[in-house]
């Protein structure tokens, strides 16, 4: 048995270790909230939490700060009052009490040096070390990337620029900030690393600076950024010819290198790459869970397994989500809190590319497809309509899929072989094998004859799966369970519907350009409440109930 396996923590030990880090994050978050004037329930407003974490990531980004200071020096020549250290954070604050509570947006000023000082007091002085701030902020950046994947389909745009838009399901973590990308490599899709490698190959051809820099590689060695990218791709790629292709890219000529990367990406739609899935919540949600669980909190500090679903549910009971005027499609439309709760759930669990019918079977309320949602960008808007706690909860749970490679020479009992699954639940293959074969058949090697042989072997692997597609199942023997079924006594069978969350698959479709027709919205009188607008007495039993319940419960 390897030392690594011998030193592996038990679930209880792992949760306790997680709790130490999570509690330090919470304390730093509370201190920064107080620094910018947030108190009590204001710290539990989701949009405030997202804004604070973004400010922390910016303040810890040395290269960003260098650029900012350079611009500041230029600006100071024109304006002597310009302060490069100043940072503004847009937040939601509460005013009033009892039944007269209102919310409004404000910009609070603080300084980068003050935020860094607070972080050092809670995490230690070496914020540049990956083990100190890197992993903490890496998970924060991963959540932000998951959010953007759902709202804007960032991965599709990246895939279109670097090959085919059909590869977007390989782009988990496409929006993650560059400085956290290598720290979070095992949580990032192979398509993101392939896009980076193509950028480096193009940069080398164009003579750009930095492409030949010395960076740290595995096993303590150093090499070029392209070598680092290809090491990551080789580790993630399906065993066999795809990994052999990855090893050839660094020394290949421009055309062969790009085509080899295209083959790896297109084949990975079916010959699935390795990726690690975890639940990641904003720190305001961890704070909400701690306030409820108190002494039991450490037992729920889990990123996977049943307790990850439980702690998410507990946090959802206490957080507040804002409804602003203005959605992605319509500046006059009011956001739906229930839709934002769905996006939050999908971002925490990284479910943008999971089978939507499976996700729908695991939660308490009906879910919507992306094109039917009324959501903004989760930043603090100008006009706050209301702040409510959402009702959405998980009612079932499943183990997270770690996506280890399928061995085609076994009795077809390998792990799942599509690239979108997050949960290890048995299902049929949903990948379009014929389309993958069409993509691969377009590829021809230019000069390096061994590449042609490797391409042939890749096609053979695809064909084996294609011929046996009806018999092969992903995650054979794995199921979902009721949330109270801790011992997995009663597995729940799932019949795959293969429904995507993103309703369209037209590669030329851009959700930002396609606008829904604006619906006329009656202007509200800001001096009266919504209940009065509906002709209801705020102090009546029905009025009090409507005021306290989230929107999705009001519809019942």
From Swiss-Prot:
Keywords annotated in UniProt: Capsid protein, Helical capsid protein, Host nucleus, Host-virus interaction, Ribonucleoprotein, RNA-binding, Viral nucleoprotein, Viral penetration into host nucleus, Virion, Virus entry into host cell
Keyword Lipoprotein: no
Transmembrane segments: none
Molecular function terms from GO: RNA binding; structural molecule activity
A matching Pfam family: Flu_NP
Region (Disordered): 516-556
CC per GO annotation: helical viral capsid; host cell; host cell nucleus; ribonucleoprotein complex; viral nucleocapsid
Predominant localisation class: virion
UniProt subcellular location: Virion; Host nucleus
Physiological role: Encapsidates the negative strand viral RNA, protecting it from nucleases. The encapsidated genomic RNA is termed the ribonucleoprotein (RNP) and serves as template for transcription and replication. The RNP needs to be localized in the host nucleus to start an infectious cycle, but is too large to diffuse through the nuclear pore complex. NP comprises at least 2 nuclear localization signals that are responsible for the active RNP import into the nucleus through cellular importin alpha/beta pathway.
Protein name: Nucleoprotein
């Amino acid at each position: 048995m390897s030392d690594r396996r011998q030193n592996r923590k038990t679930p209880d030990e792992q949760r306790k270790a997680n709790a130490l880090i999570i509690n330090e994050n919470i304390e730093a978050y509370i201190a920064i909230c107080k620094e910018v004037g947030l108190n009590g329930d204001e710290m539990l407003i989701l949009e405030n939490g997202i804004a604070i974490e973004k400010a922390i990531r910016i303040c810890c980004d040395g290269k960003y700060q260098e650029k900012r200071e350079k611009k500041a020096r230029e600006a100071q020549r024109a304006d002597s009052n310009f302060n490069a250290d100043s940072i503004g954070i847009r937040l939601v604050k509460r005013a009033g009490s009892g039944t007269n509570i209102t919310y409004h947006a404000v910009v609070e000023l603080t300084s980068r040096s003050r935020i860094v000082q607070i972080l050092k007091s809670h995490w230690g002085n070496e914020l540049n070390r990956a083990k100190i701030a890197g992993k903490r902020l890496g998970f924060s950046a991963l959540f932000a990337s998951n959010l953007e994947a759902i709202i804007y389909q960032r991965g599709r745009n990246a895939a279109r620029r670097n090959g085919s838009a059909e590869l977007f399901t390989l782009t988990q973590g496409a929006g993650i900030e560059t400085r956290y990308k290598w720290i979070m490599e095992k949580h990032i899709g192979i398509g993101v690393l392939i896009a980076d490698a193509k950028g480096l190959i193009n940069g080398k051809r164009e003579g750009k600076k930095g492409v030949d820099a010395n960076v740290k590689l595995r096993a303590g060695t150093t090499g070029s950024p392209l070598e680092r990218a290809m090491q990551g791709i080789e580790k993630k790629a399906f065993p066999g010819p795809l990994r052999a292709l990855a090893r050839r890219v660094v020394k290949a000529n421009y055309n062969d290198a790009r085509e080899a990367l295209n083959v790896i990406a297109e084949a990975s739609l079916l010959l699935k790459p390795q990726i690690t899935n975890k639940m990641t919540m904003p720190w305001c949600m961890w704070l909400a869970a701690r306030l409820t669980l108190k002494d039991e909190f450490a037992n729920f500090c889990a990123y996977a397994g049943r307790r990850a679903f439980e702690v998410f549910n507990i946090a959802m009971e206490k957080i507040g989500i804002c409804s602003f005027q203005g959605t992605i499609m319509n500046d006059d439309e009011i956001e739906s809190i229930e839709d934002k709760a769905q996006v939050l759930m999908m971002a925490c669990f990284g479910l943008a590319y999971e089978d939507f019918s499976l996700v729908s079977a695991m939660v308490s309320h009906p879910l919507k497809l992306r094109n039917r949602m009324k959501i903004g960008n989760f930043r603090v808007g100008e006009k706050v309509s209301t702040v409510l706690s959402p009702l959405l909860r998980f009612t079932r749970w499943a183990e997270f899929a770690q996506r280890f490679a399928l061995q085609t020479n076994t009795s077809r009992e390998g792990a799942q072989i599509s690239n979108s699954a997050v949960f290890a639940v048995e299902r049929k293959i949903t990948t379009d094998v014929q389309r993958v074969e069409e993509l691969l058949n377009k590829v021809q090697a230019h000069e390096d004859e061994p590449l042609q042989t490797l391409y042939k072997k890749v096609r053979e692997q695809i064909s084996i799966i294609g011929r046996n597609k009806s018999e092969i199942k992903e995650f054979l023997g794995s199921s979902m369970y009721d949330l109270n079924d801790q011992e997995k006594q009663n597995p729940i069978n799932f019949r795959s519907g293969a429904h995507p969350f993103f309703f369209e698959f037209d590669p030329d479709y851009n959700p930002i350009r396609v606008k829904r027709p604006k619906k006329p919205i009656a202007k509200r009188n800001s001096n009266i409440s919504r209940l009065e607008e509906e002709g209801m007495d705020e102090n009546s039993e029905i009025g009090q109930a409507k005021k306290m319940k989230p929107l999705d419960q009001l519809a019942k």
